A protein has these predicted regions:
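Alpha-helical scaffold domains
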Residues: 4-210
């Protein structure tokens, strides 16, 4: 049933050529929020290789302008291509286009823009905007970036307040908030401990964190 017709794009054709049916079944179970019909079944190493091969080409440039995509792997490929964008402004602009279409935790969590590694001060401001967004996975992404880039040498006390201030009911936001605070306890114990001792988090997040 899951087969592209004659109207497939070059990228879709390339993805179907990398298909592993057993992996398709596994992935579909792992990500309950998406329609199994949209999962082709491409393993991540093959997807990363394809991303490396097309990064910076006109094909990739066109693809980045075209969300929403039809398939889960197209979204993951899109995320990998964004992660490879070398300049900060370019990466943020591409994320602003793409984040509203992210519809699952796995695509959200593979987004790791290399342009963010220099910890520009602008990123912290951008994270503030993301965690206040209406879209579930934009908020999850913002919390993930706060965890990835600001729990080591870039840490500030206000980051904990920012994360604690995210009061959302969506499971995939609350899980990321708990992950953030669990990591904060490991990396910034003295700063993070009062948030648990003084019950500053909602009960669900508190319980998941510990």
């Amino acid at each position: 049933a899951l087969m592209g017709g004659g109207d497939m794009t070059d990228i879709q054709t390339a993805l179907f050529a990398l298909r592993d049916p057993a992996y398709q079944a596994f992935q579909s179970k792992l990500i309950p929020t998406i329609d199994p019909q949209t999962v082709i079944g491409v393993r991540m190493p093959a997807l990363r290789k394809l991303a490396r091969e097309i990064a910076g080409t006109p094909v990739a440039e066109g693809f980045l302008q075209e969300p929403p995509h039809r398939y889960y792997e197209e979204n993951n490929l899109h995320g990998l291509l964004i992660s490879a964008i070398p300049d900060y402004d370019g990466a943020v602009a591409a994320l602003e286009t793409f984040l509203p279409y992210v519809d699952n935790w796995a695509t959200c969590d593979l987004l790791s823009p290399k342009a963010f590694r220099k910890h520009p001060p602008e990123l912290r401001k951008q994270i503030r905007r993301w965690v206040e967004d209406a879209h579930t996975y934009t908020v999850r992404f913002g919390l993930g970036m706060l965890m990835s880039f600001y729990l080591d040498e870039g840490f500030q006390m206000e980051d904990l307040d920012l994360a604690a201030g995210v009061r959302r009911e969506e499971y995939y936001v609350k899980m990321m908030a708990a992950w953030y605070f669990a990591t904060a306890l490991a990396k910034q114990y003295d700063a993070a401990l009062p948030y648990l001792r003084q019950r500053r988090l909602d009960r669900w997040t508190h319980n998941k964190t510990i």
